[in-house]
C-alpha cells in the first residue's frame, strides 16, 4: 500500500458493547496506526461516543439506519435490512471506499453480507473463519480454520481451507513454508472419521501445501504446526475452549499463591510474568478472526469485544491490507481451482 492511508470500515453498532467500546478502539487505531476509520451506524450515538479532541481527518461517520441483533436469523436479516450497519460497511468495501471491514456483531450476518456483497474468491466453495492461536513457542502462532463458518464440511472444503490458510500464514504471518496439519483423533493416517480420512488423502496429494500429517488436540498449541484445518463445528468448540484457558490458569495461580506478606511479595515479583502470560493467551491480543475466501479483507470480532480487541482487530486488518493478502489469494486462484472433488 506504500504511504497510502489504509481505510477500515467499522460496524459501530455490532457487539455487546457497541457503540462506545467499538468507537474507542477505532479512534485509538486511527491515532496509533495511522489508519482512517469509517464508523458506520447511528450518527448521533457514534458522535456521543467519540472521545474529546478526536482527529476527524482520520475518523468519518457513515450513517446507517438499522442494526442486526444477535438473535436474528442472519441471512433473512441481511436481505431484509439493506441499510443495516453491517451491509452499509460491507458496501464501502465493495465500492472500494474502504480497504477492509471489522464487525463484532452477528458473525453469521457478517458472513452472509460478505458473501452477498463481495462474493467468493474464484475456486473457493466455502469461506472459512480463521483465527490465530498463541503457542508455547513465543512469536510462532498457529492459524486455525474453520472456527465457525461451516459446521458441516466436505473434504474438498477442508483442502481449500489448507491452501487459503497457507497463503495467509506465508504472506501475513511471515511463515517461510507453512506446516499444515489436519485436526484429528490420532497421528496415524488410518485414524479418524470418513471426513478426516478422505481429507487426509487430499492434503497428502496436494503438492501446493506443506502437509505434515494429523494434529491431535495436544498438538494445537505445540508450535509444531503453522496451519491446522478442521470443520467449523469442531473448530468453534476448540476456539471457545482455548479462549477460556488463559483466565483459568491465571485464576488457579491467584488461588495457589500463599496469603499474607509472603504471598504479597511473591505476587509483586511475579506480576510482570503474569502480565506477559495473560498477553500471550488473551484472545483480545489478536482482536478478531479473518473471514478467508471472500473477495475482501473481513475481520470478525468476538461479541464481547472491548476497545483493546477492536484496536488489535484493526491492526490485523491493516497488516492484511499492507501485505496485500487479497492480491496473494487472488493470484493463487489456479491452485484453488485445482483442488479435487
UniProtKB/Swiss-Prot annotation:
A Pfam family for this UniProt protein?
FA_synthesis
Reactions catalysed, semicolon-separated, are: a fatty acyl-[ACP] + phosphate = an acyl phosphate + holo-[ACP]
The metabolic or biological pathway listed in the UniProt record of this protein is: Lipid metabolism; phospholipid metabolism
Q: Name one GO cellular component term.
A: cytoplasm
* Chief location: cytoplasm
Task: Identify the SUPFAM superfamilies for this entry.
Answer: Isocitrate/Isopropylmalate dehydrogenase-like
Query: What Gene Ontology biological process does one annotation of this record name?
Result: fatty acid biosynthetic process
Compartments annotated for it: namely: Cytoplasm
Molecular-function GO terms, alphabetical: phosphate:acyl-[acyl carrier protein] acyltransferase activity
Q: What class of enzyme is it?
A: transferase
Q: List the disulfide bonds.
A: none
Q: Which residues form the signal peptide?
A: none
Q: What is its EC number?
A: 2.3.1.274
List UniProt keywords, sorted A-Z.
Answer: Cytoplasm, Lipid biosynthesis, Lipid metabolism, Phospholipid biosynthesis, Phospholipid metabolism, Transferase
Q: What Gene3D superfamilies does the entry give?
A: Isopropylmalate Dehydrogenase
Q: Does the keyword Ion transport apply?
A: no
**Self-association or partners: how does it assemble?**
Homodimer. Probably interacts with PlsY.
What the record says about family reads: Belongs to the PlsX family.
- State the protein's purpose: Catalyzes the reversible formation of acyl-phosphate (acyl-PO(4)) from acyl-[acyl-carrier-protein] (acyl-ACP). This enzyme utilizes acyl-ACP as fatty acyl donor, but not acyl-CoA.
- Descriptive protein name: Phosphate acyltransferase
Organism whose genome encodes this protein: Nostoc sp. (strain PCC 7120 / SAG 25.82 / UTEX 2576)
Amino acid at each position: 500500500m506504500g504511504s497510502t492511508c489504509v481505510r477500515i470500515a467499522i460496524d459501530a453498532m455490532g457487539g455487546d458493547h457497541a457503540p462506545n467500546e467499538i468507537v474507542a478502539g477505532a479512534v485509538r487505531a486511527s491515532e496509533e496506526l495511522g489508519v482512517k476509520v469509517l464508523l458506520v451506524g447511528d450518527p448521533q450515538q457514534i458522535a456521543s461516543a467519540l472521545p474529546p479532541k478526536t482527529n476527524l481527518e482520520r475518523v468519518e461517520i457513515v450513517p446507517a439506519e438499522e442494526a442486526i441483533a444477535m438473535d436474528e436469523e442472519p441471512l433473512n436479516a441481511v436481505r431484509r435490512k439493506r441499510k443495516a450497519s453491517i451491509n452499509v460497511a460491507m458496501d464501502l468495501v465493495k465500492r472500494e471506499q474502504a480497504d477492509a471491514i471489522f464487525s463484532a456483531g452477528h458473525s453469521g450476518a457478517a458472513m452472509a453480507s460478505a458473501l452477498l456483497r463481495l462474493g467468493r474468491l474464484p475456486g473457493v466453495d466455502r469461506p472459512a473463519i480463521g483465527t490465530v492461536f498463541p503457542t508455547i513457542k513465543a512469536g510462532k502462532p498457529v492459524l486455525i480454520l474453520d472456527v465457525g463458518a461451516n459446521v458441516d464440511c466436505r473434504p474438498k472444503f477442508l483442502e481449500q481451507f489448507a491452501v487459503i490458510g497457507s497463503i495467509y500464514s506465508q504472506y501475513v504471518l511471515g511463515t517461510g513454508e507453512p506446516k499444515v496439519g489436519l485436526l484429528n483423533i490420532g497421528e496415524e493416517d488410518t485414524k479418524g472419521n470418513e471426513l478426516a480420512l478422505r481429507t487426509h488423502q487430499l492434503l497428502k496429494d496436494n503438492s501446493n501445501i506443506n502437509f505434515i500429517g494429523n494434529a491431535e488436540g495436544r498438538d494445537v498449541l505445540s508450535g509444531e504446526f503453522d496451519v491446522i484445518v478442521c470443520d467449523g463445528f469442531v473448530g468453534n468448540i476448540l476456539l471457545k475452549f482455548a479462549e477460556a484457558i488463559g483466565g483459568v490458569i491465571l485464576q488457579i495461580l491467584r488461588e495457589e499463591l500463599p496469603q499474607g506478606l509472603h504471598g504479597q511479595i511473591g505476587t509483586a515479583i511475579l506480576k510482570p510474568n503474569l502480565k506477559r502470560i495473560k498477553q500471550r493467551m488473551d484472545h483480545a491480543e489478536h482482536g478478531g478472526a479473518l473471514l478467508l475466501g471472500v473477495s475482501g479483507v473481513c475481520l470478525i470480532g468476538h461479541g464481547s469485544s472491548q476497545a483493546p480487541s477492536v484496536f488489535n482487530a484493526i491492526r490485523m486488518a491493516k497488516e492484511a491490507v499492507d501485505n496485500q493478502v487479497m492480491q496473494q489469494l487472488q493470484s493463487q486462484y489456479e491452485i484453488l481451482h485445482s483442488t479435487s472433488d
